[in-house]
Amino acid sequence: MTNIRKTHPLMKIVNNSFIDLPAPSNISSWWNFGSLLGICLILQILTGLFLAMHYTSDTMTAFSSVTHICRDVNYGWLIRYLHANGASMFFICLFLHVGRGLYYGSYMFMETWNIGVLLLFTVMATAFMGYVLPWGQMSFWGATVITNLLSAIPYIGTDLVEWIWGGFSVDKATLTRFFAFHFILPFIVAALAGVHLLFLHETGSNNPSGLSSDSDKIPFHPYYTIKDILGVLILILALSLLVLFSPDLLGDPDNYIPANPLNTPPHIKPEWYFLFAYAILRSIPNKLGGVLALVLSILVLALVPFLHTSKQRSMMFRPISQCLFWLLVADLFTLTWIGGQPVEHPFIIIGQLASILYFMLILVLMPIASLVENNLLKW
């Protein structure tokens, strides 16, 4: 009798994706982050669902409802902090996942990569709208500043902003629609992640060497299920330590002050995972230019496959490209630090130089380095 997992229409899909999937024998722990992102998404949807049962999306009661969740709901504080810090874990995994793709040339799978870039945009939009919901000072002013950027779009800008706000300022209508979008978007993310996997399984996974691994495949289960479980345990440990010992470490104290349209916080800044893009936005004195740079800071990832000039796929055997890659990582850390600093000397010039270097590395220096390496290897 044939095994049910190979014949049943639904079980067959699961089997071909997670059990009998042929995987390269040499993929390292950098390939764990896909499954970790899946776990993060499930955690966020579940904790978010329980939070939504107690949250009210009204400007008068939103802040109080979050306080009520933390004080009066059984383990409400735990659910709330798991959700808030789960977002940070989500982004850590996302950045490492994208970094892995850049380093090992996974972007050569064009469909998978482009869906991934779309996923990154969607997750960022979801996180931004989620940050507005507690209706603290940073929620309100963050929403005001970021939505206001759309007014830089010529001709339709002002109308567009007022349309998004549902009025002439960030108010009840804005909060209600942000809650609605924040609820629906994770399910769109889950659907896109399914498409992401669908395209990945058309080609099979890449591997650290960047060479074809068709001649040496092993079944996903038990080898990579066990390996992924280790990653999941480390993720759960890290998240638990964060939630139980310093839940507010990555948050902003200003968000414990209820939203007040009459009082602007001294330093408006987003959550830590947006600071690099925020620094790029602020480094350009022109409003429209800043908005374009902000969008391009993520959209530039979609150009990476077209900028691949090397004869080799992976950076594993390309020392010059490796140096530039780690310079890019250091640059992103610098941008993240600058994004959290006030707009004054010397932070302004550091931010501008780091922003220029960011785009230079991706668009100019890395493709040139690849060509140099080709010539050094007489290719």
From Swiss-Prot:
CDD domains: cytochrome_b_C, Cytochrome_b_N. InterPro entries: Cyt_b/b6_C, Cyt_b/b6_C_sf, Cyt_b/b6_N, Cytb/b6-like_sf, Cytochrome_b, Cytochrome_b_C_euk/bac, Cytochrome_b_N_euk/bac, Di-haem_cyt_TM. It is a multi-pass membrane protein. This is Cytochrome b. Its cofactor is heme b. The chain crosses the membrane at residues 33-53, 77-98, 113-133, 178-198, 226-246, 288-308, 320-340, 347-367. Keywords: Electron transport, Heme, Iron, Membrane, Metal-binding, Mitochondrion, Mitochondrion inner membrane, Respiratory chain, Transmembrane, Transmembrane helix, Transport, Ubiquinone. The keyword Transmembrane applies. GO terms for cellular component: mitochondrial inner membrane; respiratory chain complex III. The keyword RNA-binding does not apply. Heme 1 (or BL or b562) is low-potential and absorbs at about 562 nm, and heme 2 (or BH or b566) is high-potential and absorbs at about 566 nm. Heme b b562 binds at residues 83, 182. Belongs to the cytochrome b family. PANTHER family: CYTOCHROME B (PTHR19271:SF16). Its main location: mitochondrion. It is found in: Mitochondrion inner membrane. Binds 2 heme b groups non-covalently.
